[in-house]
Amino acid sequence: MGNTVHRTLPDSSPPARLLATRPCYGPGPERRAVLGEAPRFHAQAKGKNVRLDGHSRRATRRNSFCNGVTFTQRPIRLYEQVRLRLVAVRPGWSGALRFGFTAHDPSLMSAQDIPKYACPDLVTRPGYWAKALPENLALRDTVLAYWADRHGRVFYSVNDGEPVLFHCGVAVGGPLWALIDVYGITDEVQLLESTFADTLTPLRLGQARLSACPPPGSHDAANFDNNELENNQVVAKLGHLALGRPDAAVPCVARERPRPASSPALLDAELRFHATRGPDVSLSADRRLACAPRPDGGRTLVFSERPLRPGESLCVEVGRPGLAAPAAVAFGITSCDPGALRPSELPADPAALLDRKEYWVVARAGPVPSGGDALSFTLRPGGDVLLAVNGRPRGRLLCVDTSQALWAFFAVRGGVAGQLRLLGTLQSSSETMTPSGSFSGSQDDSDSDMTFGVNQSSSASESSLVTAPSSPLSPPVSPAFSAPEPTGSRNGECTVCFDSEVDTVIYTCGHMCLCHGCGLRLRRQARACCPICRRPIKDVIKIYRP
């Protein structure tokens, strides 16, 4: 018999998962560096606009705002913190650094495999997990650290601050490489020495915030829409993080806090949220606090328990004090009794309510600069809905038909700051309300008419969120037009330009509130609607008076 050569067959099983083992440390600032080679950027697997220094520790994006995707040259261990310093930040672009992990080996990627953006291009593929750093945290010399644990949860912290949970469901059965997209205002980043993340106790896990930054642009929106399953997992596991029980729910607890200084002292606190609500929003036991923990918001519509009364101001607090507010508030008025609705019928986007037969009017109540702001919405007897922010009048937001019962509703923006608190209501005894009496200000405020401001600054799809009547209606004489009697001319001024005389009737609703020039321009807009009753405009007809 001849000699037999024994060959070792190549192991086709996936490589063993790297797990960073370390002694237990008590609380404190002490950190221990990870043994072994510090991570560097992969020299070949990078976007076409990325330039690396000689040590592959510093990545700089040249030209444009994209094509800045990079990876680490080696897998990252579990609990190993990927630490980045933001070396250069350039204002002017929209969006900031994207970061996360991938289960795909960058060494096997070709230049064609690396797209312009990590979000949404990469995260829509299996095996990629990344999200955006909020722009308000993307400051020069900021140190970002992020890591994955053995449960597939990903946390990040800024400047050694408290951990923020921003992903669940990451596959940790195989190697994970760090994914870093030098995007937007972030021009240059530097990889620092890795350290171990402290093991989070159940108490600290309960305090770990859920990441939520509002998508400011179309590419950012993919951070919240690209991986619905993972976002659901985040919410599903929050109770487990906080309480150590897989079946625990995330409570929405109304804690006593001082009333915002800008809100009136004599608010009536009898009004609560209606029990009918979207499936992705929870209410406190007293139904005065609505919480939406999901970063993407989801279906979070909430309604007032009863219809608003003419002359009544509804006061709410948006977000959490000290945290950036999630986004602009979506506020609306409807003639539909919430008790007749099923939670499954409530959409994520209030615009979808356009298909219903009831009377629905929706507006965006402007950007909220910070969490804890107090907003008031005043329904005047004539149909005007006035907005005030922290006691400052912002003008008219809507004009509605007060001949029927009208409930208020909100879409609660999701995330760590995603909550809406009912502060109470204030009833005015007079039809003409003052800023101090109504908490909403005068219609003559310098911020002008919010209804038209929203329409002019928003896209066509947002400018006229109102349902058409289910059956043809005869032209009504609306109280919303007659109550705030215009001044300056016999026929009144156009409610758009406030210059020309009203000489046009809107078909089919019959309202007269426009000059002919503004009427023609308004009719040419997509989904044009009457400024008073918000019904669709089919035509505008000029009238002649003797």
From Swiss-Prot:
**Annotated metabolic or biological route of this protein:** Protein modification; protein ubiquitination
EC top class, as a word: transferase
Residue ranges covered by zinc fingers (RING-type) = 494-534
**Localisation:** Cytoplasm
Q: Which domain of life is it from?
A: Eukaryota
Question: What are the BP-aspect GO terms?
Answer: Notch signaling pathway; protein ubiquitination; ubiquitin-dependent endocytosis
Biased composition annotated in UniProt, kind: Low complexity: 457-471
InterPro entries membership: B30.2/SPRY_sf, Neuralized, NHR_dom, Znf_RING, Znf_RING/FYVE/PHD
Which reaction does this enzyme catalyse, per its entry? S-ubiquitinyl-[E2 ubiquitin-conjugating enzyme]-L-cysteine + [acceptor protein]-L-lysine = [E2 ubiquitin-conjugating enzyme]-L-cysteine + N(6)-ubiquitinyl-[acceptor protein]-L-lysine
Matching entries from Pfam families are given as: Neuralized, zf-C3HC4_3
Q: Region Disordered: list its residue ranges.
A: 429-490
Which key words are in the record? Answer: Cytoplasm, Metal-binding, Notch signaling pathway, Phosphoprotein, Repeat, Transferase, Ubl conjugation pathway, Zinc, Zinc-finger
Described by its record, this protein's role is as follows: E3 ubiquitin-protein ligase involved in regulation of the Notch pathway through influencing the stability and activity of several Notch ligands.
Q: State what protein this is by name.
A: E3 ubiquitin-protein ligase NEURL1B
Provide the species name.
Mus musculus
